[in-house]
């Protein structure tokens, strides 16, 4: 069957979800293909006593170990970076630690400041409204006033430091180093239908409670209500091109 659409998105993770949501009000025919499926809150490891064991099986960060039907093998033997991903609605926002810092203004000028790589073609000020919008959509918690950034106000107050965090802070104070609690996507108050964190379990393998933001519970409900079509269990095997070498469609 040959489907014609206005916008085709491959993958429902962080970028795919945000693009789908941002275009939804245009009323174009938008389809997103996701090779995984929806993950029910009852499926997350933190619902059971065996949650630590499941971090090495069906919720391992490495797809080679996880070996779900929706996964595929990845050879990272010669890579200094080991893959961390998840195949499902929400993509790798399902499986991350909720650590959510913005880039610093200096990160956009590494060539100018440090003589390495290249400067970005845009600067922090240009992207700041989009950072703020994403913070609002994902529900960021943090402490305002960090002098390493231009002024910003996270939507929610920060999570408590905890004993280890406080110890690190004390050590850096003794060394005269600047430190600041990092922004996270962990709800510290009730926010947009999500309850605040109750320390149900480790953040990485998905949050059964929904306190940790993932795009399946933040961007996608809005996008789908606005008319975006999300097709799950659809693995793209080829991107087709036209006579000019431009992408024209997919085979899945």
Where in the sequence are the language-model features?
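Short low-complexity, flexible loop/linker segments enriched in glycine and/or proline
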Residues: 45-49, 194-198, 245-248
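Conserved redox-cofactor binding core of oxidoreductases
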Residues: 56, 71-73, 99-102, 111-236
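Short, well-ordered loop/turn elements at secondary-structure boundaries
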Residues: 3-4, 25-27, 82-83, 88-90, ...
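Conserved beta-strand-loop-beta-strand element in the redox core of flavoprotein oxidoreductases
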Residues: 238-252
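Glycine-centered flexibility motif
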Residues: 17, 36, 90-91, 139, ...
């Amino acid at each position: 069957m040959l489907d014609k659409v206005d916008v085709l998105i491959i993958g429902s993770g962080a970028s795919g979800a945000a693009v789908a949501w941002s275009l939804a009000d245009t009323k174009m025919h938008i389809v997103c293909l996701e090779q995984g499926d929806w993950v029910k809150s009852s499926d997350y490891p933190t619902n059971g006593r065996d949650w630590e064991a499941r971090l090495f099986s069906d919720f391992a960060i490495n797809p080679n170990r996880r070996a779900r039907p929706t996964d595929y093998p990845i050879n990272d033997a010669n890579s200094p970076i080991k893959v961390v991903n998840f195949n499902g609605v929400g993509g790798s926002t399902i499986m991350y630690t909720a650590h959510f810092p913005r880039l610093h203004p200096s990160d956009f000028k590494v060539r100018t400041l440090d003589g390495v790589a290249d400067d970005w073609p845009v600067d922090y000020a240009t992207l700041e409204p989009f950072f703020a919008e994403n913070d609002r959509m994902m529900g960021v918690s943090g402490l305002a006033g960090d002098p390493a950034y231009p002024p910003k106000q996270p939507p929610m107050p920060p999570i408590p430091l905890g004993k280890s965090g406080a110890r690190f802070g004390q050590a850096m104070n003794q060394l005269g180093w600047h430190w600041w609690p990092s922004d996270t996507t962990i709800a510290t108050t009730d926010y947009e239908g999500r309850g605040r964190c109750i320390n149900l379990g480790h953040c990485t393998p998905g949050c059964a409670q929904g306190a940790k933001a993932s795009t399946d519970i933040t961007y996608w409900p809005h996008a789908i209500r606005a008319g975006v079509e999300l097709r799950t269990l659809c693995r793209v095997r080829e991107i087709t091109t036209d006579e000019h070498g431009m992408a024209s469609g997919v085979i899945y």
